[in-house]
Amino acid sequence: MKKAPSPLISLIPIVVLVLLLFATIRTFGSDALSGGSQVSLLTTTAICILIGMAFYKIPWKDYELAITNNIAGVATAIIILLIIGALSGIWMISGVVPTLIYYGMQIIHPSFFLASTCIICALISVMTGSSWTTIATIGIALMGIGKAQGFEDGWIAGAIISGAYFGDKISPLSETTILASSITDTPLFRHIRYMMITTIPSLIITLIIFTVAGLSHDASNTQHIAEVATALNEKFHITPWLLIVPVVTGILIARKVPSIVTLFLSTLLAGVFALIFQPELLQEISGVAVSGFDSLFNGLMMTVYGATNLHTDNTVLTDLIATRGMAGMMNTIWLILCAMCFGGAMTASGMLGSITSIFVRFMKKTVSVVGATVCSGLFLNLTTADQYISIILTGNMFRDIYAKKGYESCLLSRTTEDAVTVTSVLIPWNSCGMTQATILSVPTLVYLPYCFFNIISPLMSITVAAIGYKIARRS
């Protein structure tokens, strides 16, 4: 049996990664994801591998297998990312998102915008089981409405993400919900019911904060909203017919059509509507002087795969309707691949297990057991950079420990979701954090302080354990 690295040695790649990422963000700022962060991850991956091979005789094939397995595990997510890039571009240029923004500004009062946004995203995410799909569709529209009403990007993104991850956490259609229940051998609906003990209070507190913030917002500047609405009408053909696209998308989701198929069909339908309702915009994007098949085809393809920058007389709207297409997802995909390399190297070397074993030593009472699980889940989210891997590892590490201490598996499954599912989006180099920052065009560290549900959930898990409320024990 190979000797595992000590916790102190295992921390070397983590410390180096933190230092490199700090230097990268300090040097490159918002451009850190354009290469600096990826190089930092690959550098620490190499350090981890070298330590394991030189001092612990861990063969290269072990690292290669762990890394390739990690990358294979996110292959579907990468495909979804590419389609989301195409969808976000074509939903904008076809007029779907502008139409949602136009009508949304007339329906949602600014004073209750943040709370309404959180509730809307929560309901859609519960029905879809996907925070990614929710944020990539209605989230983008709500982002536009919020900007038009004068809210800061961080507040809007925080409300969107809080609601979306509430739904992702408790929906029976969610992959994370199913994964957490299955990895801990907990019946799905037992898992969901037990999560309500920590999830509902977290959401209520979140809605109170957003309501207070909304009521404190200066909603008197209706002129700005009117200017954005006028600019939308001038640039796009706004019509209720465009609402067919999100309605069809909702029907596909309700019928449990696979995410990739749903997103692809939604992109295809929006493309057809772009040809029907926005031919002038497609010609403008193409740069072809003469209108015809070439200009329409060129504009449509450029919208799907590349960046578009349409000019309007309203600065806020010009920034809002800029799209990046599939190409805009490349830095995110690049970072995910590098993060999977790091997570695989840490797992194969035994360093990940060595570090997480530290938490087990302090597990005496219920609050320390739950606290150790929360800390391990957060640590795994930081180091593996993937919520699915973190859920699997957390469940596997603590399953036997919870059983020996007499706790029901639903306590572990709930704590795992409280610690992992909702916090993954708060980490800049985690696949969730990278994705949502890219989709919403808001840096992770900008929206982090406003994702109240995501911040409160792990704290609520520890609080409930500390007071001993409804702790599930084996009879």
Spans of features found by a protein language model:
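Membrane-core helix-loop-helix motifs of multi-pass transport proteins
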Residues: 1-11, 143-165, 169-246, 250, ...
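Alpha-helical transmembrane segments and their membrane-interface exit regions
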Residues: 46-50, 164-169, 270-274, 400, ...
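Central hydrophobic cores of alpha-helical transmembrane segments
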Residues: 136-142, 160, 262-270
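Transmembrane helix interruption/hinge and helix-loop junction motifs
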Residues: 150-152, 254-260, 385, 442-443
